[in-house]
Amino acid sequence: MSPRHLLVLGLLLAPLASAQAQDPAPKEYRVLLVGNSLTYTNNLPALLRAVGASQGTTITTETYAAPGGKLDDRVDEGHVSAALLARKFDAIVLQEQGGHLAACMASVQEQRKAPCAASVKAYGTLSGIASAQGAKVLLFGTWGPDDRWQGKLDRSVRMLAKKHESRVFDAAGALEALRKAQPDIKLYPDGTHPSTLASVMLALALYRDVTGIAPIAKDLRVTAPLLPVNAAVSPASAMESQTGLAGDGKTTVIPANLVEPLVKALPEPKDEDEDAEQRGSRGR
C-alpha cells in the first residue's frame, strides 16, 4: 500500500480510535450494600441495577438491610463478612443508622460511648475485609434535619473514611444538589426517608461513584418493587433473594424525561478535602 493510501486510511481510522478510547467497553459490576431503611426504601439496589442496565452496564447487587439496622448488627450476624469472603465484589456501600450514631465521630464525648465504638469497629471490620478482597469501599453519607446536624454528619463520615482508607458516597450532597435545582421538590415526604425521585437521584450518583462514569438520561426499567419504609425486610439473607422483594416479573418504567433533570443536577465530583472545606454544612 502506498504512503498516500496509508495516510488516508489513518485519517479515516483516527476518529474511530478516539471514540473507542473515550467509550470504554461496558463492564459487569458486583455491588454489596449494607444498611437499613434509607437503603431499602424505594429499593435503591434495584434502582442502581436499572441505571446500570440503561447504560449498557450489568450491575449485580447483594443487599443486607433491616429497619433501623446498625452496622455492628450486620457484623455480629456474619452474613456480610461471609459474602465478602465467598464472592468477588467491585464495591461495598456501608450505610450506618442515622441520628447520633451516624454523627458520633464528630463529637469527642460520643466517641467514648459504646455505641460509637461499636460502629467504628464495624466500619473497620467490613472495610478491612472488603479492601483485602479488592473492593472499593464507599461510606454512605446520610442527611440531617438542619445545617448544624448536617455538618456533624459530614465531618463524621469523612473522619471514618480517612480512618479506614475508604471513600464517601455523598448521598446528602447529591440530594442537596437536586433541591437546589428544584426548590419545590419534596425530598423526604416523612421527614426522613427519600422520595422515589430522591432515591433515583441516589442511584444515579451511586452508579457514577461505582463505575467512575457519569450516567446518561435514559428510561429506567426497574424489575423489583419500589419498597415502602415499612417493608418486611430481613437481614437473615440477601434482600434480592427474599420472597416479595425480588420481583414478580413486573417492570416499573421511569421515563428518561424524569431522569434527565436529575442527571443534570448531579454535583461535580470533588476532592473530598476540598469538598469538606467548601461545604461546612448543608440543610434541606
Where are these regions (language model features)?
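Extracytoplasmic/secreted envelope proteins and their assembly/folding machinery
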Residues: P45-L48, Y123, S127, D154, ...
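Conserved SGNH/GDSL esterase-like catalytic core that processes O-acyl groups on lipids
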Residues: E28-L32, L38-K113, A117-A118
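Boundary at the C-terminal end of the N-terminal hydrophobic targeting segment
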Residues: A19-A21
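Catalytic His-Asp segment of secreted/periplasmic serine-dependent ester chemistry enzymes
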Residues: D147-V263
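Bacterial N-terminal signal peptides that target proteins for export
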Residues: M1-L7
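Bacterial N-terminal signal peptides
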Residues: V8-P15
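A short helix->loop->beta-strand "cap" motif at the edges of active sites that frequently abuts
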Residues: G128-V137, S166
